[in-house]
């Protein structure tokens, strides 16, 4: 059996899809379906069982036997960068992760987990997986950073695979439930379908991010699992592209000559807490042996637009 926590969420459900595509269906999805809209991420996927997150945590703490587990993909977390309830964030993203990590270590189960580029904070260069480059801007980033630090202490003695991925700006299918935390591509497409021009924040021409297609993220996870590689790795494309490039790709898909980008005021609450530039350093990822290319914004957004608008 393979366990995917956060399996009804964005990246988790895409990992389930990638596993399905390789013939794996003996999958336990763990999630919190209080937001019932997330069920749509699972309707076309094949899984063996579903378990509520709270019940799962209780079982892990109790040391319950789940039978033979081939891997745990731990994608379950609070991923809101605007959530400031630190206790909630640390319970969800730190304590839960530690419990599950030790459960896997005790049983030599490969453990792959979601870290984040938010660990790097507001820096504009050297996005490298080393302590001296890490200074998160929000409590979400801090919770991810702290777990990475915990893993670093454990790794030298670990007898089984432990691997974390610092996801950069992920976009693609199955993120519709994320609301304001969904990708720029998702929001721009919604605006166009609502008869509006796509909107970007003022100053967006100076913002560049490392946008990575979710299918590429899932492929990285499965490769590292198959190859039994441990460590903490950036998961981005190694390219910084502009928000304008995302808007251009959305406009190109809709092929409407009347569409143009509108600029809106930058929100006060995000000032000083916003990553204006991200670009994954892929040196360690490539050294580990991962050689596959990553989609450009133009390529990935075009694929995503086809998926989003397939029923239109």
Curated annotation (Swiss-Prot):
<comment type="similarity">
    <text>Belongs to the NAD(P)-dependent epimerase/dehydratase family. HldD subfamily.</text>
</comment>
<feature type="binding site">
    <location>
        <begin position="75"/>
        <end position="79"/>
    </location>
    <ligand>
        <name>NADP(+)</name>
    </ligand>
</feature>
<feature type="binding site">
    <location>
        <position position="92"/>
    </location>
    <ligand>
        <name>NADP(+)</name>
    </ligand>
</feature>
<feature type="binding site">
    <location>
        <position position="187"/>
    </location>
    <ligand>
        <name>substrate</name>
    </ligand>
</feature>
<dbReference type="Pfam" id="PF01370">
    <property type="entry name" value="Epimerase"/>
</dbReference>
<feature type="binding site">
    <location>
        <begin position="10"/>
        <end position="11"/>
    </location>
    <ligand>
        <name>NADP(+)</name>
    </ligand>
</feature>
<feature type="binding site">
    <location>
        <position position="209"/>
    </location>
    <ligand>
        <name>substrate</name>
    </ligand>
</feature>
<feature type="binding site">
    <location>
        <position position="170"/>
    </location>
    <ligand>
        <name>NADP(+)</name>
    </ligand>
</feature>
<dbReference type="GO" id="GO:0097171">
    <property type="term" value="P:ADP-L-glycero-beta-D-manno-heptose biosynthetic process"/>
</dbReference>
<feature type="binding site">
    <location>
        <begin position="31"/>
        <end position="32"/>
    </location>
    <ligand>
        <name>NADP(+)</name>
    </ligand>
</feature>
<feature type="binding site">
    <location>
        <position position="169"/>
    </location>
    <ligand>
        <name>substrate</name>
    </ligand>
</feature>
<feature type="binding site">
    <location>
        <position position="180"/>
    </location>
    <ligand>
        <name>substrate</name>
    </ligand>
</feature>
<feature type="binding site">
    <location>
        <position position="53"/>
    </location>
    <ligand>
        <name>NADP(+)</name>
    </ligand>
</feature>
<keyword id="KW-0119">Carbohydrate metabolism</keyword>
<feature type="binding site">
    <location>
        <begin position="201"/>
        <end position="204"/>
    </location>
    <ligand>
        <name>substrate</name>
    </ligand>
</feature>
<comment type="function">
    <text>Catalyzes the interconversion between ADP-D-glycero-beta-D-manno-heptose and ADP-L-glycero-beta-D-manno-heptose via an epimerization at carbon 6 of the heptose.</text>
</comment>
<feature type="binding site">
    <location>
        <position position="178"/>
    </location>
    <ligand>
        <name>NADP(+)</name>
    </ligand>
</feature>
<keyword id="KW-0413">Isomerase</keyword>
<feature type="active site" description="Proton acceptor">
    <location>
        <position position="178"/>
    </location>
</feature>
<keyword id="KW-0521">NADP</keyword>
<dbReference type="GO" id="GO:0050661">
    <property type="term" value="F:NADP binding"/>
</dbReference>
<dbReference type="InterPro" id="IPR001509">
    <property type="entry name" value="Epimerase_deHydtase"/>
</dbReference>
<dbReference type="InterPro" id="IPR036291">
    <property type="entry name" value="NAD(P)-bd_dom_sf"/>
</dbReference>
<dbReference type="InterPro" id="IPR011912">
    <property type="entry name" value="Heptose_epim"/>
</dbReference>
<protein>
    <recommendedName>
        <fullName>ADP-L-glycero-D-manno-heptose-6-epimerase</fullName>
        <ecNumber>5.1.3.20</ecNumber>
    </recommendedName>
</protein>
<dbReference type="GO" id="GO:0008712">
    <property type="term" value="F:ADP-glyceromanno-heptose 6-epimerase activity"/>
</dbReference>
<feature type="binding site">
    <location>
        <position position="144"/>
    </location>
    <ligand>
        <name>NADP(+)</name>
    </ligand>
</feature>
<feature type="binding site">
    <location>
        <position position="38"/>
    </location>
    <ligand>
        <name>NADP(+)</name>
    </ligand>
</feature>
<feature type="binding site">
    <location>
        <position position="274"/>
    </location>
    <ligand>
        <name>substrate</name>
    </ligand>
</feature>
<comment type="subunit">
    <text>Homopentamer.</text>
</comment>
<dbReference type="GO" id="GO:0005975">
    <property type="term" value="P:carbohydrate metabolic process"/>
</dbReference>
<comment type="pathway">
    <text>Nucleotide-sugar biosynthesis; ADP-L-glycero-beta-D-manno-heptose biosynthesis; ADP-L-glycero-beta-D-manno-heptose from D-glycero-beta-D-manno-heptose 7-phosphate: step 4/4.</text>
</comment>
<feature type="active site" description="Proton acceptor">
    <location>
        <position position="140"/>
    </location>
</feature>
């Amino acid at each position: 059996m393979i366990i995917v926590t956060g399996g009804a969420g964005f990246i988790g459900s895409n990992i389930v899809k990638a596993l399905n595509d390789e013939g794996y269906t003996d999958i336990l999805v763990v999630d919190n379906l209080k937001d019932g809209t997330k069920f749509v991420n699972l309707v076309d996927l094949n899984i063996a069982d579903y378990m509520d997150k709270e019940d799962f945590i209780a079982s892990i703490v109790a040391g319950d036997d789940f039978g033979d587990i081939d891997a745990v993909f731990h994608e379950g977390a609070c991923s809101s960068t605007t959530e400031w309830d630190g206790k909630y964030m640390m319970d969800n993203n730190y304590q839960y992760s530690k419990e599950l990590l030790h459960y896997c270590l005790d049983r030599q189960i490969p453990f792959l987990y979601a870290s984040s580029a938010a660990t790097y904070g507001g820096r504009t260069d050297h996005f490298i997986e080393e302590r001296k480059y890490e200074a998160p801007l929000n409590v979400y980033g801090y919770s991810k950073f702290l777990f990475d630090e915990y893993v670093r202490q454990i790794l030298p003695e670990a007898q089984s695979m432990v691997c974390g991925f610092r996801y950069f700006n992920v976009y693609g299918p199955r993120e519709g439930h994320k609301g304001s935390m969904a990708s720029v591509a998702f929001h721009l497409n919604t605006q166009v379908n609502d008869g509006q021009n796509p909107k970007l924040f003022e100053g967006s021409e100076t913002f560049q991010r490392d946008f990575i297609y979710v299918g590429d993220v899932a492929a990285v996870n499965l490769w590292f699992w198959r190859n039994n590689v441990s460590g903490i790795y950036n998961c981005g494309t190694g390219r910084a592209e502009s928000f304008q490039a995302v808007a251009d790709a959305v406009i190109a898909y809709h092929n409407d000559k009347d569409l143009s980008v509108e600029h809106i005021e930058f929100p006060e609450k995000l000032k000083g807490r916003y990553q204006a530039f991200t670009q994954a350093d892929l040196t360690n990822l490539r050294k580990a042996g991962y050689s596959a290319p990553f989609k450009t914004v133009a390529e990935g957004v075009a694929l995503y637009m086809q998926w989003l608008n397939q029923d239109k």
